[in-house]
A protein has these predicted regions:
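Generic hydrophobic, amphipathic alpha-helix propensity
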Residues: 8-17, 33-34, 58-62, 66, ...
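Amphipathic alpha-helical packing segments from all-alpha helical-bundle domains
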Residues: 81, 117-143, 154-158, 182
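C-terminal peripheral helix-coil segments that are non-catalytic and often amphipathic
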Residues: 85-93, 128-140, 163, 173-203
Length: 203
């Protein structure tokens, strides 16, 4: 009969998230992880497998709270409010990040995904989920007449996703709300731009 674990799995996984998020995948050793998680190296391997497996579990935990739970919480807001609130929370998270750790998802995208095809697919699933959220809001906004930007809804959603990723990269250099919100105001204005060729000027 297996012995019960002498630690809280959710608690130690959260510690692993913090460790990987602060140091990155390559710079984090198993010894670093064990010390941060408050368990032995043997317990780490027995419970979670190797460093790569633990990184994926930490990534999943971050994505669940930082992406999927956020999407679920914002999904039923009015469409423009849902989009703007998503970005506003990103700006606030950057402001509240004195260590400038950035976004775990973006960090993983830049560090590990280019060299790990399996993990790259994992990252793309998350990016696709965010783009799908933006697409749904654009489609709902058009149905309500509050999003008037021309172009395919998925392309507009891709523009929003690209701006989001760029915002998170920039926030590691300059997380000031003034700079970040200054990037977002024109973006939000574009969503309200009239369809091309209708002869009217944007408000």
């Amino acid at each position: 009969m297996a012995r019960p674990r002498a630690f809280d799995e959710a608690e130690v996984l959260e510690a692993a998230v913090d460790c990987f998020w602060s140091q990155g995948y390559e710079a984090t050793s198993v010894r670093d992880l064990a010390a941060e998680m408050g368990i032995t190296g043997a317990s780490l391997y027995n419970a979670f497998g190797d460093k790569r497996a633990l990184y994926e579990l930490a990534f999943d935990r971050y994505v669940r709270a930082g992406v999927h739970d956020r999407i679920a919480r914002l999904e039923d807001l009015p469409p423009l409010e849902a989009i703007e609130t998503f970005f506003a929370e990103v700006v606030e998270n950057a402001r509240a990040d004195p260590a400038r750790k950035g976004c775990f998802l973006v960090n993983a995208t830049l560090e590990l995904a280019p060299h790990d095809p399996e993990f790259r697919g994992h990252v793309m699933d998350v990016l696709d989920a965010m783009q799908a959220f933006f697409r749904r809001q654009v489609e709902k906004g058009r149905a309500l007449g509050v999003v008037t930007r021309s172009g395919a809804a998925d392309e507009v959603a891709g523009m929003l996703l690209g701006q989001l990723l760029g915002l998170r990269v920039l926030s590691r250099v300059d997380p000031s709300p003034e700079r970040l919100n200054g990037m977002l105001r024109p973006l939000f204005a574009l969503l309200r731009a009239p369809p091309q060729g209708d002869g009217t000027a944007p408000p």
